[in-house]
Amino acid sequence: GVVIVTSRFERRAAGLYHNTAVVMEKDGTIAGKYRKMHIPDDPAYYEKFYFTPGDLGFHPIDTSVGRLGVQVCWDQWYPEGARLMALQGAELLIYPTAIGYESSDLPEEQERQREAWTTVQRGHAVANGLPVIAVNRTGHEPDPSGQTNGIQFWGSTFVCGPQGEFLYRAPKDEEVVEVIDVDMQR
């Protein structure tokens, strides 16, 4: 069996919703969940109209494969969550993500943003001595408001070891299914 980390649109109460990562154990039970704390307010991202910041704090989730420090998307830009998870015994940091370029960004700016995204998460690995799995969406999503040409998600899912070394890098523009062995004893 496998442990699965997935995202969902969670209704906590009438009119109160969260972008939530759910961790499912090998037997299908829910091991835990994490509600996204940082809600972006950038062009073509409209999460602030749907989601409330999380209220569960930063706590690792115990599973049969280890203690997982799970955060969602934009949370990856802030070092505090990774550090708090590590200090509480997380053995692996996982970031399910949907991030990309706003359509009007120049190619050079697009690449700088993507590289910054990779660098900050590799920094979490190095600073905390933990492997990181960053899973990102790929493809295009039009802007329903018509204010921009939408978001081109930059893919580039990756896995890195505790020294920030790449164990796997996916392409920018295609969906892939890959199994990566991560040495949790390092």
Roles of regions detected by a PLM:
Residues 1-5, 73-177:
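CN hydrolase (nitrilase-like) catalytic-core segments centered on the catalytic cysteine
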Residues 4-7, 11-12:
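Flexible, acidic active-site loops/lids enriched in D/E/S/T/G that coordinate Mg2+ and/or position polar
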Residues 7, 20, 33, 169-171, ...:
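Residue-level detector of high-confidence beta-strand sites
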Residues 11-16, 148-152:
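Short loop/turn motifs at secondary-structure junctions and domain boundaries
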Residues 12-123:
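Active-site catalytic loop in hydrolytic enzyme cores
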Residues 22-24, 158, 178-180:
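Conserved hydrophobic/aromatic positions in well-ordered beta-strands
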Residues 185-186:
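A short C-terminal boundary segment appended to hydrolase-like catalytic domains
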